[in-house]
Amino acid sequence: SALVEILGSVGTVEQLISHPAGSVVTLCANRPSAEWYFADGFTGADSIEQIVLTNPFSDATVVDISFVTSETERTPANLQGFVIPPQSVITLSMDEQGARNEPVLAVSVRASSGMLIAGRSQHYLGQGRLGYSMSLGASALSTQWSFPDGEKVDGNSEQLVIYNPTKIDRSLSVVFINGSDSANSLEPAVVTAPAGRVTLLNTANIPGLPAGYYGIVISTNDLVDEGGVVVEQVVNRRIGNSVGTSVLLGAPTGAASTVWSAPSGVSAGLADSLVVLNATPVEGFVTVSQVGPAGTVALSGLESIPVPASGVVVVAVPAGLPQSEIVIQSTVQVVVQRLLSRGNDLVGRAAVLALPHLPSPDVGK
């Protein structure tokens, strides 16, 4: 792990990982938390899942770790009151904690003393998943999660993994957003997420879901308390006998913004470099710019791209663009996701959100 401190100003940081099973970009935490959650986990076909626990402080952090499989919730005795020494990193291989060959594996990390940062490293080796991913956990539950890049495409499979670590069953609405008028829009799917369990929603089973791209917004219907759930999206993109798996933690409540940054840039030349979700009832306009020696300059042809109300737009970033920070500005609050090349001529995409500027700035049309 690395700690980056920016003195006298503000900045954006993310991590680029090169792996033989696929390169990925992962967001960095801007603060520690006393709790971390991972909805999706997978050790099927001897796939490797590791939870990475970082304590950047000069005092020890004490945590309780539990996990949920398709059959039960487990709280291993050796992971209760687990001590993370000061200024240290500990990696837990989930197969060594009694979770080998599990197709469903959600993890909770709760600190009883101190705070920490928790991430997840995944190397998928079979049972429909191949590739590598690295991501932060969710540092809090949320009553809403948004995903810009829903895909119903030949060869792809898409699954929403919902983890409810609370003691109360949750009723959820799953809304699919594709810019259709009210006459053609889909009714929200209603899903019950039982307390302490993982719920899987295969979007291929949603009746009437049209082919193509759509956004997804998952919200809790009950107002019992301020708790919520954690939701991740798993997409397997298949070409022939090859598969590329991506896992994305959604954007939580309050993450929509008019300005988003991608510090490490995008994969230029892809037809689906960026996907922008506009969940508002108002049409917006998006401009994609690059940061360089001359400052922030709009990319030719990517000025004022219309984004339909309650819709998504897929943006192709031109080939030949040098790798540097990209800034996405919108006249309405949006959620922005990047789809990145996995490198090594591997099929599929790596998926990661851009970074929202919060509170959301005012951006003129």
What is the predicted function of each stretch?
Residues 67, 73-153:
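Solenoidal tandem-repeat scaffolds enriched in leucines and small polar residues
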Residues 10-56, 115-165, 225-281, 289, ...:
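Conserved functional hotspot residues at active sites or interaction interfaces
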Residues 7, 110-114, 219-223, 331-333:
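Beta-strand-rich extracellular modules
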Residues 1-3, 72-102, 106, 181-211, ...:
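Intrinsically disordered, low-complexity Pro/Gly/Ser/Thr-rich segments with frequent PxxP/GP/PP motifs
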Residues 3-4, 35, 327, 364:
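Extracellular/secretory-pathway and virion-surface proteins
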Residues 91-106, 133-140, 149-164, 175, ...:
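Extended non-catalytic domains of envelope/secretory-pathway proteins
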Residues 222-223, 283, 290-313, 320-352:
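C-terminal beta-sandwich/jelly-roll accessory domains of carbohydrate-active enzymes
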Residues 53-75, 111, 159-182, 273-296:
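Short acidic, flexible loop segments centered on an aromatic residue
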